């Protein structure tokens, strides 16, 4: 099987949460408007309860759909039973946690919402997805995310991220094209 297809397949439940958050988000900010002693918001208005829930749910739904057709196309499964839930939750919630972590860091650095932070913006969600998935389902993670897959994901994700953000900007789902 093509390693590019394999890599993107494994990462789809981590790639889509931020798109779902942008499309279905809004409403109450996760940080409830709170600022830290540095005077900056914890996350800012761009990270909302509804967006976070939509992102995690979207990633899980996409992963469930993928899992239902994986065998037909000879692509890897995300497991079954509890492992399936843990893997998909790890990939999708971890993606959102990685993005939240980057937002937290950007606020501490005094960066405004939407400010570009090269490579951090493109890979924060990957690191979060990998970290949480490894914690929740280490055997599955180690079997699927081999060194070649990890390297390829790190190389192609910034390109895919930019492409998705430009589309999001063009359709009005994002305020910045990065």
UniProtKB/Swiss-Prot annotation:
It is a multi-pass membrane protein. It is found in: Cell membrane. The chain crosses the membrane at residues 53-73, 85-105, 117-137, 140-160. GO terms for cellular component: plasma membrane. It catalyses: 2,3-bis-O-(geranylgeranyl)-sn-glycerol 1-phosphate + CTP + H(+) = CDP-2,3-bis-O-(geranylgeranyl)-sn-glycerol + diphosphate. Its EC number is 2.7.7.67. Its cofactor is Mg(2+). It is an enzyme of class 2 (transferase). The keyword Transport does not apply. Pfam families: CarS-like. Keywords: Cell membrane, Lipid biosynthesis, Lipid metabolism, Magnesium, Membrane, Phospholipid biosynthesis, Phospholipid metabolism, Transferase, Transmembrane, Transmembrane helix. Coiled coil: none annotated. GO terms for biological process: glycerophospholipid biosynthetic process. Its main location: membrane. GO terms for molecular function: CDP-2,3-bis-(O-geranylgeranyl)-sn-glycerol synthase activity. It comes from the Archaea. Pathway: Membrane lipid metabolism; glycerophospholipid metabolism. Catalyzes the formation of CDP-2,3-bis-(O-geranylgeranyl)-sn-glycerol (CDP-archaeol) from 2,3-bis-(O-geranylgeranyl)-sn-glycerol 1-phosphate (DGGGP) and CTP. This reaction is the third ether-bond-formation step in the biosynthesis of archaeal membrane lipids. HAMAP family: CDP_archaeol_synth. Belongs to the CDP-archaeol synthase family. This is CDP-archaeol synthase. It comes from Methanothrix thermoacetophila (strain DSM 6194 / JCM 14653 / NBRC 101360 / PT) (Methanosaeta thermophila). The gene is carS.
